[in-house]
């Protein structure tokens, strides 16, 4: 019998949640996802030093203002890392918009267009790029605009059903509902561990997946943020799963049958009217876990973006 990673690939598109080229070459995923924390981690690897240098040189040609140079270097570094990753995968790279723009629709749209232009200028076409945005109301509205321009988006930091519903109604290409971070919250609150089949993060993604399929939404569901392979295996059959290298290694080393847990019902039920802004805020606010985790996720990504900028500033 083949290992669990090989079996999972037959049911689900496997995506690598990393910016590290060696790991991507090893596990040969379809796609790869990055975020500010992963870019910061990758930037500290020696083999990426030339990419940082090239990004700084680019920034110096764009502006004499140091603050602007730092911004341009960070953007180009994310794109340069993305370009390297695209050499090793057949699919798409997800590159994230600065988390500090999470509540700024116009700023998010402008930054996304800038990142896509950087990729396009390097010969990378839009069908190989996903722009990551936080699943705030403003982020979802930004994605709605970008999708109409042919820029596909990956809506991340998704913790509530309200966020998932709003994303589908906006016609976004893909969502990344988080699993492990949801479980973390409930584990801390209830003081207990959860079996994979009762894991609150697993149940959240399952509910979202079934809802999308029931109403025939085309938005791709890509489970993210896993703490163990049990969570991953409970979501076998999900459209895509983005998995960190350590868990890919664990799946590769594991023997035993992988059972399809999520099945597309191919429904075509009449869809409810799209949520208003007020309805979205009210429904999202009913979920204290989601409110806390969305805010925390944005803050943490912003902190790591700041660390990356400090690292770049020291090199300018």
Curated annotation (Swiss-Prot):
Family matches, as CDD domains: Transaldolase_TalAB
- List the Gene Ontology MF annotations in alphabetical order: transaldolase activity
Quote the catalytic activity from the record: D-sedoheptulose 7-phosphate + D-glyceraldehyde 3-phosphate = D-erythrose 4-phosphate + beta-D-fructose 6-phosphate
Q: Where are the transmembrane segments?
A: none
GO cellular component, as recorded: cytosol
Q: Entry's InterPro entries?
A: Aldolase_TIM (IPR013785), TAL/FSA (IPR001585), Transaldolase_1 (IPR004730), Transaldolase_AS (IPR018225)
Q: Which residues form the active site?
A: 132
Alphabetical keyword list: Cytoplasm, Pentose shunt, Schiff base, Transferase
Q: Which PROSITE patterns match?
A: TRANSALDOLASE_1 (PS01054), TRANSALDOLASE_2 (PS00958)
One of the GO BP terms on file: pentose-phosphate shunt
Its annotated compartments are: Cytoplasm
Q: What is its EC number?
A: 2.2.1.2
What pathway is this protein said to act in by its record?
A: Carbohydrate degradation; pentose phosphate pathway; D-glyceraldehyde 3-phosphate and beta-D-fructose 6-phosphate from D-ribose 5-phosphate and D-xylulose 5-phosphate (non-oxidative stage): step 2/3
Main subcellular location of this protein, as a coarse class: cytoplasm
Membership in a protein family: Belongs to the transaldolase family. Type 1 subfamily.
Q: Which HAMAP family match?
A: Transaldolase_1
NCBIfam families this protein is in?
Answer: PRK12346.1, talAB
* Primary role: Transaldolase is important for the balance of metabolites in the pentose-phosphate pathway.
Q: How does it assemble?
A: Homodimer.
The name this protein carries in UniProt is Transaldolase
